[in-house]
């Protein structure tokens, strides 16, 4: 049972990933690899934290929510306490910088949903790819679709894609580097 269904996320001034998109994403991940235990999840631009809290509710071993806005960080911390989400760690900081410093190859899932108006999607995807273990997953929410050639150039392969309104939702998997 998802945390969203257990309790409404209550974050002022932010809209989480649409319910239908979030449900589809987690169905994709569960069908690909149903065992979440031990997963290290990074939600680099947490916002409401809906995606990260959902990963925790599915049994992820450790979920790190990174958010720059101090007010949102306080609200995320309050949600963590209210939901008794022990696997969740809330950090205040820049998601792009945090991903750049993340241990290489240590994340099983990176949730990447930066504001649509930023010019550095490519940098964020590259930093997320570096953080991922081989076979790890990158969920990318973007204002446009990325084609398979762009994705492959970043060391990733497309797994699933969904368009819902203005949201282009990509589930990508890190592939082993070519010798």
Predicted region positions:
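Conserved SAM-binding strand-loop segment of SAM-dependent methyltransferases
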Residues: 85-95
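Single conserved hydrophobic/aromatic residue that forms the stacking wall/gate
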Residues: 1-11
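Conserved SAM-binding loop of SAM-dependent methyltransferases across substrates and taxa
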Residues: 48-61
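A short acidic, Gly/Pro-enriched loop at the edge of an enzyme's catalytic core
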Residues: 101-109
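Conserved SAM-binding loop
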Residues: 76-77
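Conserved class I S-adenosyl-L-methionine
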Residues: 36-47
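Conserved SAM-binding motif I beta-strand of class I
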Residues: 62-67
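Short glycine-dipeptide loop
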Residues: 132-138
């Amino acid at each position: 049972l998802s945390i969203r269904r257990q309790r409404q996320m209550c974050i002022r001034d932010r809209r989480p990933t649409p319910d239908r998109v979030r449900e589809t994403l987690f169905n994709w991940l569960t069908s690909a690899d149903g065992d979440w235990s031990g997963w290290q999840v990074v939600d680099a631009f947490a916002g409401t934290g809906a995606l990260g809290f959902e990963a925790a509710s599915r049994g992820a071993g450790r979920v790190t929510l990174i958010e720059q806005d101090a007010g949102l960080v306080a609200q995320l911390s309050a949600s963590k306490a209210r939901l008794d989400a022990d696997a969740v760690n809330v950090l205040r900081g820049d998601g792009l910088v945090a991903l750049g410093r993340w241990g290489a190859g240590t994340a099983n899932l990176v949730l990447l949903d930066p504001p649509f108006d930023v010019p550095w999607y490519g940098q964020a995807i590259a930093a997320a790819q570096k953080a991922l273990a081989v076979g790890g997953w990158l969920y990318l929410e973007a204002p446009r679709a990325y084609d398979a050639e762009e994705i492959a150039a970043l060391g990733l392969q497309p797994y699933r894609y969904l368009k819902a309104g203005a949201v282009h939702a990509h589930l990508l998997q890190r592939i082993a580097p070519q010798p």
